[in-house]
């Protein structure tokens, strides 16, 4: 990305889409060079087969919340996987759809109801504060887990670096403590540089969470390694022994081929989520809900949206995805 455009998330996202072939080729090379095992999945079925070949039934696994893991239905693929995202845990416990990654749907929910859900998640009774007890339990489960499964916010293809951005710190636990880390990334999350990736991440948080940046960043460049022990390189000393990355297509190439790629500019800020929920009466809601996930889900579900519903829809987008772009992608 040229210097003049570095602070323009729309231009960054446009270049990511336009250069997707080049970025994919570069990502495969640089990730592999850093010791990651790279897998290409053309659809959710291929992703499921890869994950099931890695995570056997008898292996313990934790996961964080991400659009890709929801897209492929990680809970169905790995039934024993344990969710660690606090807001997702509460949403599931309350029977609510966690459709906005930046804002949990807890309107008109009492603190007592949330407390009950977290108490049910917690395995043992302790005197310590509830959130601290849940956090400690997640760390203990991570120490015993064979796999930590996450999505990711970006891959900087020039260095082969996986970037995670979050507020809770649980993604760091899931990606760093278990013996092996598996990250699932949509092809649209490939960036040419760290600067471009961070600008898009910041734009997502500013527009979705209304804050300048997330609390935690994790940079993962291959499996953990250290040369501190007698000058010999040792893997797995301060993190996972192996890092696997699944690069997921699952309809993204179809949108590109049909010239419907503008929705892939989406940075998952969630600004459009409340407006799009009006479309979802009677339909299964993609989680998180945004122009990209709705368009990808539509390739399979073929949502029937009335003209009146289109006329009532209104949203603003920081990367200028328009109603016309969304409507074109849904045709």
Name every feature range the model reports, one short phrase each.
Residues 1-259:
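The feature marks the mature, well-folded catalytic cores of soluble enzymes
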Residues 201, 235-263, 273-274, 278-331:
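Ferredoxin-type iron-sulfur electron-transfer modules in oxidoreductases and energy-metabolism complexes
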Residues 266-267:
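Short Cys/His-rich zinc-binding micro-motifs
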Residues 270:
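Active-site-proximal glycine-rich helix-loop-beta segment
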